[in-house]
Swiss-Prot record:
Cofactor(s) this protein requires: Ca(2+)
Molecular-function annotations in GO: calcium ion binding; calcium-dependent phospholipase A2 activity; phospholipid binding
One term under GO cellular component: extracellular region
Tissue-specificity statement: Expressed by the venom gland.
Disulfide cross-links: 42-131, 44-60, 59-111, 65-137, 66-104, 73-97, 91-102
Record's protein name: Neutral phospholipase A2 ammodytin I2
Length: 137
């Protein structure tokens, strides 16, 4: 039992905000963030450059830009407070930085949900060599 508890604590520490973001994405799309949105287009996944390939990829571009405007905490590791109320994502807590990170994730998850019809499997594992002419935020 103690080993299970230690593993759970370690997983929470490692996943942090990325787990929360993935949970938001699943709630809004019914898709796995890891399987569907990591390494999609030019912006979904680690890093990002080039021109967004479709509306789904643009959600990731806007999310990257939003993270770039967050000051005072690491967006990918920060653990924030949020809930789901009547189908909506509600960010909570008093820390302005954590709320900003939550809002970035909330807006992106909603964007994915609103653009499910643009998701195109041809952009999954899209070669980064095709991502040129980077747009500005």
């Amino acid at each position: 039992m103690r080993t299970l508890w230690i593993v759970a604590v370690c997983l929470i520490g490692v996943e942090g905000n990325l787990y929360q973001f993935g949970n938001m994405i699943f709630k809004m799309t019914k898709k796995s963030a890891l399987l569907s949105y990591s390494n999609y287009g030019c912006y979904c996944g680690w890093g990002g450059k080039g021109k967004p390939q479709d509306a789904t990829d643009r959600c990731c571009f806007v999310h990257d830009c939003c993270y770039g405007r967050v000051n005072g905490c690491d967006p990918k590791l920060s653990i924030y407070s949020y809930s789901f109320e009547n189908g909506d994502i509600v960010c909570g807590g008093d820390d302005p930085c954590l709320r900003a990170v939550c809002e970035c994730d909330r807006v992106a998850a909603i964007c994915f949900g609103e653009n499910l019809n643009t998701y195109d499997k041809k952009y999954k594992n899209y070669p980064s060599s095709h991502c040129t002419e980077t747009e500005q935020c």
